């Protein structure tokens, strides 16, 4: 049998490293959380962790943006935010993205008699705001060099953000920390087509990156 391999990403600087550096008595870190919350449940746990940190006064969730399209993705995020007592967190959805199926998002439609089991106001993703304008508005209203953007999915929101008019200057002024869980930034098997390169090469703020190692097994 030919050797197979896994790519294992080892996070030298975690997506939550901005909060990890929090000092007692400091102001909560303003967070914009960008997620591909559709297929895997890990992003649900990551958002739940952010809410727990917000409960402890370590961060403030300014907004959540979604980088994959599913009719129920924004509804699920709204239900999760509501469950943790923050129903008014703005939610943005990326534009012109392919639709993705999900095995768990349908939970948001479950009802107990005539009410949603998990209360929420956003009933379909199309009701949510557009991701890039939302991020820019949140940054405009933030203090200088205060915001941490945490991307734990595709770069389908951050890449167009960097290309938006005035976005580079806005990011440089408002963002203190950009933490990206992304893919490869260099040529792999002759393939150079990676959206993450836009974030690495053209982002004017601190960007923790994860290293990738290849492990072989038989």
Regions found by a protein language model. Give the residues of each.
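Bacterial N-terminal signal peptides
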Residues: 7-15
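Positively charged n-region of N-terminal signal peptides that target proteins for export
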Residues: 1-5
